[in-house]
Regions:
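An alpha-helical, amphipathic repeat domain used for nucleic-acid recognition
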Residues: 1-185
Length: 185
């Protein structure tokens, strides 16, 4: 293990930066923000480097190699079908990746238009191989799992009630969730 700091690579000219960006997009889809962040390490600091990045991004958009709306649609479909994530989780992930708020809203409204959130939450539990909880501790684990999965508390408690859990357990979980929400707000 070397203690010397890593040597910064030589800044790329515009044509090499374009090839670098195409290679990065060839490995996986990226948003404009992600690609700009990736290219920033390969150019000079300041306006000169930013001008190269902007030129490459514009060229990639014109060639339709880089398209945030196509990315958002594909990402949402994959998260919904494969991971069985709820709308909130996908919204947070798209936002973290730099997709615009309006685009996220329209994409999610279209993708989750004919999807039952309760059915999706049950599929998420099946995917995670979660069994019906037998005590309060396991019930709290299920609640946390579904909240992380992007499902609303209304749907979560509807599922818990359908499992005929004792009223004391549901009441305890509701107070725990209310306390957690008060702390995080």
């Amino acid at each position: 293990m070397s203690l010397r700091p890593k040597k910064k690579p030589e800044p790329l000219d515009e044509s090499l930066l374009y090839e670098y960006a195409v290679g990065a997009l060839g490995r996986r889809m990226r948003t404009v923000v992600e690609l700009k962040r990736l290219m920033r390490t390969r150019v000079e600091e300041g306006d000169v480097g930013q001008a190269k990045i902007d030129a490459v991004v514009q060229r990639l958009k014109e060639q339709r190699y880089l398209d945030d709306s196509a990315y958002a649609v594909t990402f949402t479909r994959l998260r919904q079908e494969n991971d069985k994530f709820g709308k909130r989780r996908v919204q947070q992930e798209l936002s973290r990746k730099g997709v615009g708020t309006d685009l996220i809203s329209t994409t999610l409204d279209t993708a989750y238009e004919n999807v039952s959130e309760e059915e999706l939450a049950r599929k998420h539990l099946d995917r995670k191989r979660v069994k019906q909880p037998v005590n309060e501790k396991e019930s709290a684990r299920v609640v946390r799992l579904l909240v992380r999965g992007g499902f609303s508390l209304g749907v979560i408690f509807k599922i818990l009630k359908s499992w005929n859990l004792p009223d004391e357990t549901l009441a305890a979980l509701e107070t725990i969730e209310l306390n957690d929400n008060a702390v995080s707000d």
